[in-house]
From Swiss-Prot:
UniProt xrefs under Pfam families: Ank_4 (PF13637)
Keyword set includes Cell cycle: no
Annotated protein name in UniProt: Putative ankyrin repeat protein RF_pd14
Annotated source species: Rickettsia felis (strain ATCC VR-1525 / URRWXCal2)
InterPro entries with a match to the protein in the record: Ankyrin_rpt, Ankyrin_rpt-contain_sf
SUPFAM superfamilies: Ankyrin repeat (SSF48403)
Record key words, sorted: ANK repeat, Plasmid
Amino acid sequence: MLLCKIKGYTERQKLNQKLMRAAATGDIEAVQKLVLRGADIYCRDHQGDTALSLAAGSGYLDILDI
């Protein structure tokens, strides 16, 4: 569950969830595409992590340069 301040389950919320998964698994191409489509890199999950913190915590430091 994401904690972004978005009413309802919007397309942007779907993008944000995909971004979190892509960042956590090191899928840099997907991260780039999702950010270009409007995903919010500052959105936080239920544990307070952002996509960038998930990427860094998993060792995918190249994602931090996006």
